[in-house]
């Protein structure tokens, strides 16, 4: 039996789901692969709860329960720089399931010293290209869950490239939030009402502009482009926002109060698309020539036009899949499916460490 020490950075929605899945399926993974994951640390911006010889199930569940009521993971000053300064007892895996920036250097240092990294956090891979190179050098980082949650998007793309296929174009709708809004708009709901409902249901970020800016889709597009070998920097992909610049500078309360200003323009765009027999979708297109991220009117028979709600769809046009692109489709958001994508990467990484 091979024991793999892990430190998990992030104990929010995805982090909690991942911990629950690991605790629930740990015995099955041990029986199937001869691998046992051992939590030596749980970390977030409030600190680090750690034990070099491994946290007990009781300690893990207590930490999560305390976090749920607003307590920090560790007292001020405990463990110095938290997970960044913690030394694993042997070669192990650092898991980043946060949405925080600024982790790329520390994670790359772990890769350089022989540890592995598994990411659901997009920001380390969508920073400077040099950071992407440092993280992914020698296969030191797996990142399936950064694009498409638990869908096999990154692995499909890598398999196509590894087999010698040549990519022509990726076309994708990869925001569950924006997909939901498009569906609601097509049903006749004003954008203001759709955004408020999505916000109430927790589909959006606390500030919906984080979704409506398109920045999250641009990060995913950049990760896909870099996976294809394109050495792009963040500024090479610009996203079309759903709101004018003037609404980007106001407070959240004012933004929510002024959402009705967007109703008429969006109703007109939806009506125009429907009159043409098409559908309005927020689409990312990636090729060697460049990328575009924004709202597009698609023909009614386009695969992306059939999407409903928060589902994602990724279409890969390649030399081998030229006439009928290879399509990956399914839920592209949700704590459980995202955690499952992280867990699959963890198992694959652990099997490599065991070999």
Where are these regions (language model features)?
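Catalytic, metal-anchored helix/loop core of enzyme active sites in primary metabolism
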Residues: 169-174, 179, 197, 204, ...
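General beta-strand structural signal in soluble alpha/beta enzymes
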Residues: 93-96, 119-120, 141-145, 169-172, ...
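Predominant activation on well-ordered alpha-helical scaffold segments within soluble catalytic domains
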Residues: 19-23, 126, 133, 154-158, ...
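Conserved active-site and cofactor/substrate-binding residues in soluble primary-metabolism enzymes
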Residues: 9, 13, 17, 37, ...
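Substrate-binding/catalytic subdomain of NAD(P)-dependent oxidoreductase enzymes
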Residues: 184-185, 195-306
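Rossmann-fold NAD(P)-binding glycine/threonine-rich loop
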Residues: 100-113, 120-160
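N-terminal glycine-/serine-/threonine-rich beta1-alpha1-beta2 phosphate-ribose binding loop
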Residues: 1-112
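Rossmann-like NAD(P)H-binding beta-loop-alpha module
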Residues: 136-201, 215, 222-223
């Amino acid at each position: 039996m091979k024991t793999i020490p892990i430190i998990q950075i992030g104990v929010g929605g995805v982090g909690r789901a991942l911990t629950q899945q690991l605790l629930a399926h740990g015995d099955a993974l041990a029986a199937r692969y001869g691998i046992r994951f051992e939590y030596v640390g749980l970390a977030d911006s409030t600190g680090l709860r750690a034990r070099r010889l491994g946290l007990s199930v009781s300690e893990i569940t207590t930490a999560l329960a305390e976090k749920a009521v607003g307590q920090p993971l560790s007292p001020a000053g405990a463990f110095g720089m938290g997970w960044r300064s913690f030394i694993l007892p042997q070669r192990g895996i650092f898991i980043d399931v946060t949405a925080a920036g600024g982790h790329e250097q520390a994670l790359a240092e772990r890769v350089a010293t022989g540890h592995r990294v598994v990411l659901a956090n997009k920001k380390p891979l969508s920073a400077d290209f040099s950071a992407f190179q440092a993280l992914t050098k020698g296969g030191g980082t797996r990142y399936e869950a950064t694009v498409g949650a638990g869908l096999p998007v990154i692995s499909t793309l890598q398999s196509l490239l590894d087999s010698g296929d040549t990519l022509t174009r990726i076309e994708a709708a990869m925001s569950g939030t924006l997909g939901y809004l498009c569906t609601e708009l097509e049903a006749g709901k004003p954008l203001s009402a759709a955004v408020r409902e999505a916000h109430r249901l927790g589909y959006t970020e606390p500030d919906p502009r984080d979704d409506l800016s398109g920045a999250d889709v641009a990060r995913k597009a950049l990760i896909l482009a870099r996976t294809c070998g394109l050495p792009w920097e963040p500024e090479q992909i610009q996203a079309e926002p759903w709101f004018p610049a003037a609404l980007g500078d106001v407070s959240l309360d004012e933004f929510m109060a002024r959402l009705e200003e967007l109703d008429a323009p969006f109703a007109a765009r939806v009506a125009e698309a429907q009159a043409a027999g098409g559908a309005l979708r927020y689409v990312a297109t990636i090729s060697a020539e460049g990328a575009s991220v924004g709202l597009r009117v698609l023909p009614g028979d386009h695969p992306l036009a059939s999407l409903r709600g928060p589902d994602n769809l990724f279409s890969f046009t390649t030399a081998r899949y030229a006439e009928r692109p290879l399509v990956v489709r399914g839920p592209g958001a949700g704590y459980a499916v995202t955690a499952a994508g992280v867990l699959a990467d963890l198992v694959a990484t652990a099997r490599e460490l065991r070999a």
